[in-house]
A protein has these predicted regions:
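Glycine-centered hinge/linker elements that transmit conformational signals in sensory
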Residues: 208-240
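Short, polar/charged alpha-helical segment
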Residues: 40-60, 191
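Extracytoplasmic/periplasmic substrate-recognition and gating elements
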Residues: 269-337
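Hinge/lid segment of periplasmic solute-binding proteins
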Residues: 92-148, 159, 276-279, 288-291
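Conserved C-terminal helix/tail region of periplasmic/extracytoplasmic solute-binding proteins
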Residues: 345, 363-417
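Short, well-ordered beta-strand elements
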Residues: 29-40, 60-66, 87, 138
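Extracytoplasmic "Venus flytrap"/periplasmic binding protein-like
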Residues: 51, 55-119, 154, 159, ...
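Extracytoplasmic/periplasmic solute-binding protein
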Residues: 134-142, 147, 166-212, 254
Length: 417
């Protein structure tokens, strides 16, 4: 879900025309389109805006680019959907929530035929939702949204990074492995590896009516015990987040970390020729017993899409821009500038994409993934609480596995009203 990861508060709106207007000047004319995008993507969005204007000289466009993190965009959109951005990026796990709030325009007709032909089958499936018995597309995909392993190949070999135990064997308290254990988007990978999961039932309006989760069965207890055994390690940085991970690679205190493509530029800059990436490692379950086994960490796999607000005053123009933004050329450009792996099937064939370290790691990881769709809205806070309790327990040396896990699952299964 996190994919980038936090809402960046404050409205740093940037009004773009053919050039940037001077202070105090106002241009009330033209077709005003507001775009919400992540801070890291702002320069790329600006460049696409300029190209779009050049290709449409017969229209006077006025674009406003506002900073908004992708993963929690639904909260801001639904706070005031009629005045939200015309165009916004979102992770596909927010699709049902946005549709339920009447926030997304359907993609249809020849436009839908074009984007369906251009993008991977899996990415297009992520754009669809069934409402009142009818299946429709509500967004345009442009990249995969998952996580994998970054590592320093001067410290770790390909053999080392195949297993979490192998990674930790080369780590120390001042050269750690990092994983954001306070974030359920990552920690669910332990449970998914053993085919544990959840089920959500919806009414005709896509409101949740019943949620079940089996993370607290006996297998889930064993998984949680394995997680706790790793978190306790001084070589395991469990309180990691994006800023701590990138800073750790910079100063050498982190030699391997679980993260996503959004941190690629910084990590690669810090590691230089020692930069490497791979799928997630396996972890040891039932360690030291006759049932000991290696379990593959299985990541959430979703997609990021561009959506058009159903209340946009310039819906056709917004759809035209969204289609232009997600076309082959711009997906390749997005990859070149930001390392964002394309969903466009022709863009994926680009030689730069084919040879890319992270693109290869993502392709491998997608073989061990769970589609991020139909995720309980109640999932994230309880999972954050479970991980945070482990992190706190690392300091005190105490963590009640069964009690904490039961509390987590009880909170996840709390039915929506």
């Amino acid at each position: 879900m996190k994919t980038s990861k936090k809402i960046l508060c404050g409205l740093f709106a940037l009004i773009t025309a053919f050039g940037f207007s001077g202070c105090g000047k106002k241009n009330a004319g033209g077709i005003k389109i507001t775009i919400w995008a992540s801070e890291g993507d702002k320069p790329f969005v600006q460049s696409v805006v300029q190209e779009f204007k050049k290709k449409n000289p017969d229209k006077e466009y006025r674009f406003v680019i506002d900073i908004q993190g992708t993963n929690d965009v639904a909260t801001r959109v639904l706070n005031d959907v009629e005045n939200a951005a015309d165009i916004f990026t979102y992770s596909n796990d927010q699709l049902s929530k946005l549709i339920n709030g009447d926030a997304l325009t359907r993609i249809a007709g020849e436009r839908l035929e074009r984007i369906t032909a251009a993008n991977s089958k899996e990415s297009m499936e992520a754009a669809y939702e069934t409402v009142n018995g009818e299946n429709h597309a509500y967004g345009m995909p442009y990249t995969d949204n998952t996580f994998f392993l970054y590592y320093d190949k001067s410290v770790l070999t390909e053999t080392d990074v195949a297993t979490l135990d192998g990674i930790l064997s080369k780590c120390s308290s001042n050269k750690q492995f990092a994983m954001p254990m306070g974030d359920g988007w990552y920690t669910t990978s332990f449970y998914f590896g053993k085919n544990l999961g959840y089920n959500v039932e919806y009414d005709k309006n896509l409101a949740e009516t019943k949620i079940t989760c089996d993370f607290d069965n006996e297998t889930g207890v064993a998984v949680t015990e394995a997680m706790w055994s790793y978190v306790k390690e001084s070589r395991f940085k469990a309180d990691a987040n994006d800023s701590k991970i990138t800073a750790g690679f910079n100063d050498g205190s982190i030699v391997a970390a679980v993260s996503g493509i959004w941190n690629r530029t910084a990590i690669q800059e810090y590691l230089g020729e020692n930069f490497a990436a791979a799928k997630l490692p396996t972890y040891t379950l039932y360690k030291g017993t006759a049932n000991e086994e290696q379990v593959q960490l299985t990541a959430f796999a979703g997609y990021k899409l561009l959506g058009v607000n159903n209340y946009s005053k310039h819906k056709t123009d917004a759809l035209d821009f969204a289609e232009f933004f997600t076309n082959k050329e711009n997906q390749v450009k997005h990859f070149e500038e930001r390392g964002v792996v394309p969903t466009n099937v022709e863009a994926r064939k680009d030689e730069k994409v084919q040879a890319d370290i992270c693109a290869k790691a993502i392709t491998q990881q997608l073989q061990y993934s769970k589609t991020q769709k139909g995720v309980p809205s109640t999932m994230w806070i309880p999972m954050e609480g479970l991980g945070s309790a482990m992190i706190t327990g690392k300091q005190s040396g105490s963590f009640d596995v069964r009690a904490q896990l039961k509390a987590c699952v009880d909170a996840i299964e709390k039915n929506a009203k």
